[in-house]
Every structure is written in structure tokens, then in C-alpha cells.
């Protein structure tokens, strides 16, 4: 019998705020089952570095050997007499912190909701720990010795009945995987063969229950049902890997608070591009603005730390917080600000994934689920970042290291405005991550640091932000300004509006000769791409929905086709490209994607702004050209 070992470890007094397990969603796909009734209790504790030094100085000073051995010794000392196994997913993070994970066992079986994680600092010493180990009375004998449990098929039927699952098991058979795990073969109605695992689970009343963990993937719900191993009509707890969440936001493509109202959107993710949803990384489900693609939080002091920064948390996954443009100070609406930033960045992730910015291309995800590339690199999203004002930025390291977006408070209006609420700002910044990862390959993040190539980086950001926010009634005579809301100015923060009218926007390729600043050069590049956009829309029409529709791998409208070609061009062009090379890469992208069916539309767009056939690059004396190939004249 294991007694009150937590007291000896100094952990009983700690607040129980670390989640040990994914949390279930609030409904079961319309089947009338309230999963809140089966929700697992939050029963983990966390000991910070300061707590370790104060309460466990001997353990905090442990070092030497490798980090796995050190972490194992920590668990042995803090949980004497308990049995456990190391989970095979330990790693050293980019910050130098080593993370090692353990699962408590009893009589050779997992206690499925009893975990221990040890964090080792880069100095080799214990940084912090968290755990949800069970410390109550233990059964005297292993259940396999007494055969003190039901047939797994009974547990499977019990789960299906209790949760009203539409699974036909009339012809089901059991396939034994190992001593404690089985698979239910011959069923229909689930996405894959259901599975069963004999395991313990720590109950809320401090006792231990022997259960069959029945796993059923129903598509809209992916369930782990903990069915009592003796009374199979009793389900103790249910975990749903599919999270149902609501966000109160300015829904895409609303660009800023002046052009629409906030609304509540439910489950806005695309499971084809974010298979774990936005609030899970495939291992842990979160109840805050954190997931596989991004982690969003306040960063009032502008520091580098983000994991311990404030972010809204909602156990029922309702990220609905008050906001109005006249609210002040900005901290009063930080929950809404973080939520909006998280929503917009994830929308960008999902769209860019559909357009080709996948794992192998170097996108930003913690878990690449076997699709290539390097993981552990979600985007760190800092709302109301205190390191500056009237700006925003994006840091793009090579694939495998997290990107970082910092959006600031803008003081050009009264009251000040948080740039999380201007979608164009978020899209622009995220697009820096896109272009830097694609140009020159995911491992080379330094290909856009020249004046012209860096200018194109700014131009791509404006272009994607502008194209995404087009309205249903827009046409080639529509003009767009970048940053007008945060700047509190109808002129925004660019030289001219984006327009196909040369009187409204006279910029051409040779305009770059008089500019020596990347945003100005970027405005020229985006002005050229804006012509490309409308030439393709005029030919193929415009899809006003939030995602493209593909036919044989090609977007069937001009807007998303333009985005696709520009994105593909980024990956095709050389490191440190010029306008001329980027132009050629886009034309090559169309040749690859559509066999060149848009060649003339592209050339005419480029030529209109002086980037025609005869255009030549010289950093101080660019040569413009309005010529197009003979077949396009």
C-alpha cells in the first residue's frame, strides 16, 4: 500500500493546474451524450524551479551523467517504492532544456492518467517537474493472476451502449495484440478498428479502478472510454481527441474592427490540414491558446520567455471574451487579443498548408505526424508585445525551430489599438515565415536578407494579406490600403494603395531605383502581383470562400490560383532572388501546374508594371520593359 508519499516529496501543497491528459469535448456529434459528465479531473501538480530549490534542494542540484539518467533518478527519489516506465518521446528542446516523460505502472500495467515529467536545464540540473502519480492504496495482486476482469468484448459493447456509438459489432472478433491489448476486428461504423487496453485509472475519490480503455475513432469524435473491467455497463471517464471549441473573433476575411462584427465560430479548423485540431499536438489536448501549429500568449514585458506567460484558459473550450475598439487600456482586453491572434495565425496555417506549405516544405508544427520535415517548431505568438510599439515582426529560424511573431500596440489612435485585430498584420507577418522557409529550402532561412529579396519578402506579406481579404463585390477597380486601421490613417503605411490604376498607384519596376528600403521595394513587388491577381481572377473568377477548391490539384478560381502560383514560385526561385528571377519562377510554377495555360495573363501583368521580357536587374539602375512574348501580343 502506497501511503501519502506526496507530502514527503513536498508536492501536496502545490496548486493542481497542470493537465495530465487531453480533455474531452462537450458533445458527442449530436448523439445526445454529454461528455462533460465523463470529464477527467485535473489532478496534476507542478513544481517550478524556485519550488525545487526551496523544497527539494538535494534533487534540484542533481547533475552528471545523461539527462535521461538524471530524470529517472528524480522520479525514484520523489516517488520511492513506486513503479514506472519511461515514455519513448524524450528530447532536448532548442532552448537546451531536456524533457523526459514517465508513466506510472502497477503490477506491470499502466495507470493511464498517472504521468511524471522532468525538465533538465541546459546546465544539467533539474529545472522543474510535474506529475499526476497515484499515491493511494494499491491492489495486493495483479488482476491477470486472479483473472479479476471481464471479457474485453463486453467492455466494448458497454462503451458503445453508454455513448450511443453507431458501431455494428455483430460479426466482431478479438485479436490479441499483447498481454494487455486487443483489437476488435470485423466491426463497421468507426474510422478504424477499435482497440482495447487493460489498464488502471486513478479515480477522483482517490482510489484505483481497473478498466478497459476502449478506443473508438468516430471521425467527429475520437474517444478513449474507460470502462470498468468488472461492471462493463459503467464508464468512468471519456477522453475525446477531437476538441469542440468556440472562439469569439473577427471572422475571416474581416480585416479589422471597422469592417465587421465579432462572432462566435465553432471548431474553425480544417482536419485535413490540422488533424489534431488547433488545441492539440497529438499527444496533449490543451484548454488554452496552444496546439500543434501555434502557442499564443501575452508578452507585456517583451521578454523571450513565453511558456510561462499569461494566456486565456477555458476548461469548456469557450474562448469568448469581451472587446470593443474603444476599450482601454489594452490589457483590459488581453484575452480577446490573444484569442484573435491565435485564430488568425491558425487560419493562415491551414490555408497555406492547402496551398503547399506542408511539413516537407518546412511549415510550422510541433508534430509532423510522419509527413516529413522537422517538427517541434510551432509559431510563438506574442500579443501586445512590450518590446516595441507601432510595428510587428516575425522571426524565422530554419525548419525545426519555432517561428516567433510579435505584434505590438499601435499608439496612433486614441485609445491605442492592438494589432492582433488587424488580420492583414497577422497574415503579413506569418507570410515572412512562409517565404523564408520556402526560398532556398527549409534549412536555409537567410535567403531573403538582401535589399531586393528582402523587399519581396515584404511584398509577399502585403500580397497575401490583400488577396485574402478581397470582398465578394470587388473587381479590378478595387483599391486596397495596407495597415489603415492600426495606423489610424486612410493612407495606411505604404507609399500608395494597391490598385490596377496607374494613376492611383504609379509604381513600376524601375521605381526600385530610387528606393533603398525594403518596405518601399516591397510595395513595388506587391503592386506587380496585384496585377497578376486580377488578370487571373478576370480569367477564372473569384472564390470568396475561406479555402480554395481544387480540380486535379489546381485551384479552380483566380484568387487562389494566384496565391498558389506565387507560393510555388517561392520554392522554385533561387536563394536571394531578384524581381526578374521571382517573375520567372512564377511563370515556371504555372508551367508546372497548368502546363502554361496562364502564361499570357502572367506576362501581361508583369509587363504592365515594367517587368516584361526585357527587364534587367542592376541594383542601382534597373531596366524596365513592357514587352511580352510574341505569342501574347
UniProtKB/Swiss-Prot annotation:
EC number: 3.4.24.-
Alphabetical GO biological process terms: proteolysis
Pro-sequence residue ranges: 21-244
Superkingdom field: Eukaryota
Annotated binding of Zn(2+), by residue: 428, 432
SUPFAM superfamilies registered for this protein in UniProt: Metalloproteases ('zincins'), catalytic domain
Keyword Glycoprotein among UniProt keywords: yes
Family per similarity comment: Belongs to the peptidase M36 family.
Protein name: Probable extracellular metalloproteinase 5
Organism of this sequence: Trichophyton verrucosum (strain HKI 0517)
Gene designation: MEP5
